Structure formats: structure tokens, C-alpha cells
Amino acid sequence: MKVVLFYDQGRAHSVAAICEVLCAQGCAVTPHAIEQVWNDTSPCSTPLALVQDATHVFFLYAHEPMRDPAFIFFSGVACGRGMHVLLLATTTEVRDIHVFRDLVFLLEEETFEDFFRVEHERFVRQKKKRVARTALLERGYPCFEENFIATVMDGNIDIVNLFLDAGFSAALKDARGTPVLSLAVREGQDEMAAQLIARGAPVDQLSDDRAYSALMEAAQIGNRTVARLLLHAGADPNVRGSNGQTALVLAVGRKDHVLIRLLMDHGANPYLEDKLGLSAQGYAKLFNDPTLCTLVGV
């Protein structure tokens, strides 16, 4: 983030302190005295060259800036190039500016440091997105949701990280309403599931088809590794699907003693009944399995 600071002599005494504040917020600052800009005849330092690589143009005036042709020129150039134009409102004259009000951000002395902190964070995020999108295109992955979903199912962690850096959400669902985390679990992509969780995928997000959470998907296929990972990430073991079943019921149905113990240790409720009126305890009794009954507290 490169800030070009234009100031008049009335505010020259403040420049060093303001530059120090902006540098502390991660901004590269280049100050220019307005009075000298128009007198500089060096061929390598034309007025346009001063803002060539700038992302923000920041004005610091002791008087009403609309009287200054430099303000009109540089703010116009900045707006035309899509740059942010900032003006520190230090006097009543400056605060009362009406022309360009829709194009210029008026900052207060008490809050401009916070503005640049937030702005720098936003700039870094946007730059990260641009870099990631360029990298995706260079590797042959146009930035479409379908491509993101396909790479999740393929287990391509490097490309998925680029999609996430490019602004795609770890909470995205496919066309059928299945969250990408659940897709990774269904496809047996354990490392992908771990990465999505680390990047903020909601662990209790439900699929639209059967209202299963990722933990229920893991329980259905007996994936203890992912089940443990999800539980450690705070997954609710008592989420119920459209049929009323829980991850514990599914684990009992598989007679998976290790998974049952894992779920019980994380607060799974063995009394919750499905739409058939059977709970995990009920199924354990139905199977007439003493070990299952013991595990679920019968």
C-alpha cells in the first residue's frame, strides 16, 4: 500500500509525525510539498509521475483545498485511476468542503490512524485475492465455484488454498446443497477435510439432501480419523439428520466400538430417538450385542 502525501506549508510541521503513524500501519509514504510540486521541472519528476504507483492520495491542508489547483489536479487524476483520495479535516474550512465530497474521504485527526490500519488490512486482503486469482489462472483453474468444488473432491490442497485465498468460502455448497467439507468427507479426503476446517469451514453445516453434518458423514462410513478431527474442532455429536438419526446411531449401526466410545466421550446422547422411535440404546438392544449395550449405557 503506497500513500502519496501532499501538504501545504501550513501543515509542514505535522508531516513527520503523520508519516511515522502511516509507516507504523504498514504503509509506504512519499511526502510532497504542494508549493514545490508545480515548480519541479525535472523531466523524471512530472506531476503525474508523483502518483504513478500510488494506491492512495492523502492531502494535508491548513486552508480550504478547493483554492489549490494541485488538489484539483491530483484528486482528479486519483479518482480517474480508481485510487482512494483522502483529506485530513484539520480546520473548519476543510471540514466544510462540499465540492468533491462524494469523491474524497474526509478523515479526522483523532481517527485517521485507525482508518489506515483498517484500510491497510483491507488492501492486504485484496492484494492476496488478486495474487491468488492470477495464480489459479496460470495453473489452468478459472475462478468458478465448480472448479473449487472439483478440486476439493480431488484432494488438491494447494489449489484449494488458492481458491480460499482468492475469496471463495470454506462454507460453500455444491449445486445439490452439500457443503464442501461434507464432500471431502464423503470422498475420503481426510487431509482436505482437515485443511477446510483449519480455513474456517463450519463443522456443523448440514447437507440439503439428508441434513447430515460432516461428523455424521464420517460416522456413516466409519472414518474415525475425521470424526476425531471434527469433534476436536467442536462438532456437535447430537446433530440429527432428516431421519432423526445421530452420528452415534450411525456408529451403533456399524457396530464400531471405537467410534462409539469416541462419540460418547464427546457428549453424544444415547437417548435421542430417530423417526422410527429408536435411539442408540434401542438399536444396541435390537442387535442383542452386550458390548454395544455397555458402550451406550444400557
From Swiss-Prot:
Swiss-Prot/TrEMBL ANK repeat ranges: 143-172, 176-205, 210-239, 243-272
Alphabetical keyword list: ANK repeat, Repeat
PROSITE patterns noted in UniProt: ANK_REP_REGION, ANK_REPEAT
Name of this chain's protein: Putative ankyrin repeat-containing protein TP_0502
Gene3D superfamilies associated with the record: Ankyrin repeat-containing domain (1.25.40.20)
Domain of life: Bacteria
PANTHER family for this protein: M-PHASE PHOSPHOPROTEIN 8, ROLLING PEBBLES, ISOFORM B
